[in-house]
């Protein structure tokens, strides 16, 4: 149970692929102009990570060590192709928005890295959980960045959600404030870099505060009964 919890915590927070490892920054920065695009690419990446980790872990005993990387890439490419066809068939608007970044998941360092570092050494169930956790962590980072850029740039949230979820999702669109002149800095690549930098700083501050609280709690437990540690 502790190993399962550790895999989840590592994927979502401690070893977040976007905010800690800084992997897959090209699609992270390019696609997150809206919350819908960010969520779409994040879900696709999560699905690819989960399925490839599961497949590679299942086949790990029959994979020759000398040619394991080409085999991993072939498995990843097959899964990405299937996901790309699904998006093309059921979410064509999103498929057009994401464009080349869907097939580029094949070369994403996150996917290959988890295959080599985790799936090739662990069992199928734990590997699938690792892929899902890493993908969910990346999706959360993409979604937060995409939401911030969309709100600041256009004053909306979930604009174009129907491209991802169907026509019913038009009701999800929220206009935070009205603007006739979008704030282009937030929508263009410089805004993505600035937003990511602020998110990295925010995570660092949260980690430092949590570390300080744990140190204070440990110090209090170490004190003899009846002492508070106050002067």
From Swiss-Prot:
One of its GO terms (biological process) is electron transport chain. Its EC number is 7.-.-.-. HAMAP family: RsxE_RnfE. GO terms for cellular component: plasma membrane. The keyword Transmembrane applies. This is Ion-translocating oxidoreductase complex subunit E. It is found in: Cell inner membrane. Pfam families: Rnf-Nqr. Signal peptide: none annotated. Keywords: Cell inner membrane, Cell membrane, Electron transport, Membrane, Translocase, Transmembrane, Transmembrane helix, Transport.
């Amino acid at each position: 149970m502790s190993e399962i919890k550790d895999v989840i915590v590592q994927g979502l927070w401690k070893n977040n692929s976007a905010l800690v490892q800084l992997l897959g920054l090209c699609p992270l920065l390019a696609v997150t102009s809206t919350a819908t695009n960010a969520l779409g690419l994040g879900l696709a990446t999560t699905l690819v990570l989960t399925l490839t980790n599961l497949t590679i872990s299942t086949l790990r005993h029959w994979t020759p060590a000398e040619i394991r990387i080409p085999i991993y890439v072939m498995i990843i490419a097959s899964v990405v192709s299937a996901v790309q066809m699904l998006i093309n068939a059921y979410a064509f608007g999103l498929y057009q928005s994401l464009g080349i970044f869907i097939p580029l998941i094949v070369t994403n360092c996150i996917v290959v890295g988890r295959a080599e570092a985790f799936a090739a050494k662990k069992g199928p169930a734990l590997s699938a959980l690792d892929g899902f956790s890493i993908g969910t962590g990346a999706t959360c980072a993409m979604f937060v960045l995409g939401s911030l850029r969309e709100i600041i740039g256009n004053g909306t949230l979930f604009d174009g959600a129907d491209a991802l979820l169907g026509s019913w999702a038009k009701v999800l669109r929220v206009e935070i404030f009205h603007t006739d002149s979008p704030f282009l800095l937030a929508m263009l690549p410089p805004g993505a870099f600035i937003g990511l930098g602020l998110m990295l700083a925010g995570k660092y501050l949260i980690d430092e505060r949590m570390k300080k609280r744990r140190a204070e709690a440990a110090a209090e437990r170490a004190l003899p009964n009846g002492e508070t540690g106050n002067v």
